[in-house]
């Protein structure tokens, strides 16, 4: 008998698209490419997802690799990247249904320390640790 459902966050519950914050923050494709590569493709992104560093520490490392003229945009991307997360179509309804049927729901995913702040905005079903 199945009692619990385990879900991943990325591309299962939420689509992650860094272009959202890059296009909102930067007008120039060359500048977007720099921040895309150094922030979202850099080691600090992985370290944050692994819990090695906090989201607030990402700026410190990445800022050393981007021109200082881009630091305000970089800071904006670091602080507001969660707007890149959009629920996968049907995911919210699916989660409501499994909770209503009494299943335990667990989310296992590599995510930074801000997970408990941004995830409930999209999936407000209470604890994900049952």
Task: Show where each model-derived region lies.
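Alpha-helical elements of Rossmann-like donor-binding domains used by nucleotide-donor carbohydrate transfer enzymes
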Residues: 20-21, 43, 57, 61, ...
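Short, acidic loop-to-helix structural element flanking the phosphoryl-transfer center
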Residues: 71-106
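Substrate-recognition "cap/lid" segment bordering the active-site pocket of phosphatases
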Residues: 113-130
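Generic hydrophobic alpha-helical segments
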Residues: 35, 44-48, 95
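Cofactor-binding loop segments of dinucleotide-utilizing enzymes, especially the Rossmann-like FAD-
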Residues: 110
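Active-site neighborhood of HAD-like aspartate-dependent phosphohydrolases
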Residues: 1-41, 64-65
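A metal-dependent, Asp-based hydrolase signature
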Residues: 45-77
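Generic structural signal for small/hydrophobic residues in well-ordered secondary structure
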Residues: 8-11, 51, 98, 107
